[in-house]
């Protein structure tokens, strides 16, 4: 049975890549594509919007009218829109892949509550490489973390609206958890003026926003006389889109539950 996938935010940079990824993947098909209410893209063919030719799927701004056309919704939009989509998917028993970042604690709690009813993969980054980096960071933190200074440096395009990136925060969380620290109290997100000497147990974050950078993350484990750097650089959004489709296919036989890419890629067994 073919899994029918819908894309939220179909007209955005990520949405168009997701349409391409669904179209090129085996075992899935594009069932619906959505944009915000009143968008000028409503009625446009999703395939033509994504540059892959006519697909016969018109962009809609009404999930209710399209609910019989898809089994799973992939959502890389903004928190306020994603929360509306989550409520719809719970009410209509639709699975979700959520790549939206910038949720506050209430938003994350809503995702957790929804997963009692439907199956959700929620991740800050759907790149296979980034998720492998998460595991490498845990191993590096276990060996070096208590004896060095840890800094997370990230760069993205000028249009990104949240900082630090969700991926950078996830990196910090993986490190903090390994070291038994709370990122809320040990994370340092801004340094300016007379800050005093750096504390050993800090996890620092630096953010760059410039041009069309897709996404770059580097973590320093810096000790006196040596420094280990673990980096990931994305050159195309297709790596995230392909990962999201892979996650959707993995969810196909799941009734409910909250998962991330560690589950999809079985990284806990590394």
Curated annotation (Swiss-Prot):
The function of this protein is: Catalyzes the conversion of 4-hydroxy-tetrahydrodipicolinate (HTPA) to tetrahydrodipicolinate.
Give the species: Haemophilus influenzae (strain 86-028NP)
Q: What is this protein called?
A: 4-hydroxy-tetrahydrodipicolinate reductase
Task: Give the record's keywords alphabetically.
Answer: Amino-acid biosynthesis, Cytoplasm, Diaminopimelate biosynthesis, Lysine biosynthesis, NAD, NADP, Oxidoreductase
Give the record's family classification. Answer: Belongs to the DapB family.
Q: What is the lineage of its organism?
A: Bacteria, Pseudomonadati, Pseudomonadota, Gammaproteobacteria, Pasteurellales
Read off the SUPFAM superfamilies from this record.
Glyceraldehyde-3-phosphate dehydrogenase-like, C-terminal domain, NAD(P)-binding Rossmann-fold domains
Which cellular component appears as one GO term in the record? cytosol
Report which gene this protein is encoded by: dapB
- Main location as per UniProt: cytoplasm
């Amino acid at each position: 049975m073919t899994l029918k996938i819908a894309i939220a935010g179909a007209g955005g940079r990520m949405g168009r890549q997701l349409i391409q990824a669904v179209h090129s993947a085996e075992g899935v098909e594009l069932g619906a594509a959505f944009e915000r209410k009143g968008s000028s893209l409503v009625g446009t063919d999703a395939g033509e919007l994504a540059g892959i030719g006519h697909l016969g799927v018109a962009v809609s701004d009404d999930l209710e009218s399209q609910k019989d056309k898809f089994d799973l919704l992939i959502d890389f939009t903004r928190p306020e829109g994603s929360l509306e989509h989550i409520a719809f998917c719970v009410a209509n028993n639709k699975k979700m892949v959520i790549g939206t970042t910038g949720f506050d604690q209430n938003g994350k709690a809503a995702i957790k509550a929804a997963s009692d009813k439907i199956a959700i993969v929620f991740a800050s980054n759907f790149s296979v490489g980034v998720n492998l980096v998460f595991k490498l960071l845990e191993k590096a933190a276990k060996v070096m973390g208590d004896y060095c200074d840890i800094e997370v440096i990230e760069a993205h395009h000028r249009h990104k609206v949240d900082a630090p990136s969700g991926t950078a925060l996830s990196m910090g969380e993986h490190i903090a958890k390994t070291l038994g620290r709370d990122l809320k109290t040990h994370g340092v997100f801004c340094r300016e003026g007379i800050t005093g000497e750096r504390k050993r147990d800090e996890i620092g974050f630096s953010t760059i926003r410039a041009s069309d950078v897709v996404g770059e993350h580097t973590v320093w484990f810096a000790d006196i006389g040596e420094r280990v750097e673990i980096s990931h650089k994305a050159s195309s959004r297709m790596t995230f889109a392909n990962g999201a489709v892979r996650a959707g296919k993995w969810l196909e036989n799941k009734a409910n539950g909250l998962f991330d890419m560690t589950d999809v890629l079985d990284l806990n067994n590394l």
